[in-house]
Amino acid sequence: MPTRFAEVLAHGKTKLDVVYTNESREVPHFLRQLKERWLDAAEDHEKFLGLDLEYTADQRGVAIIQLCFKHHFLIFQWASSDKHCPELMDFLRSGITFATVDITNDKLKMRYSFGIEIPTGCLIDLQTVFRLRHVRTSMAHMAVALIDEEYGNMKTNFPKSQHKLWEKAPLDRINIEYAAKDACVSYELYRKI
């Protein structure tokens, strides 16, 4: 499947530039762009990436890994790749800070699927940084409070049947849009907190 480029409307007039691929050999190029072109040039308080994972239908492994910096996104479909991307593993372990929501399962899935762990202190769980009235504030609650009310229906507007299709290549447009918005929320929440 060739790499695809898409523009996704996140909320309001905010547009996201998305690269979607399952080609391991193309991932290093996009990782270099994320790091050298945008992350390295950012101010210190903006030197982090949004990270999110979508799981296989059996919930045992990683199907999709989403990386985000500002409005630049990489959606790598690990489940339909050749599962050999040492540059991605090096990138995840390189000391870059990643912001995500509810890291417990993601850490287990990365260990199971990739055989790696992101270094301690480099993976920020937004649920421990920001709380509303709940003991564990959901991503949707945080997104509505800090980004835009449109995120309140994001999960319910995404058909449950599509959650089982993260391994299907190529991904449907609705899955690409959901994955991009999901990673966008992780990035935007940490930026605002």
Tell what function each PLM region has:
Residues 72-92, 96:
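Nucleic-acid-processing active sites and adjacent nucleic-acid-binding tracks
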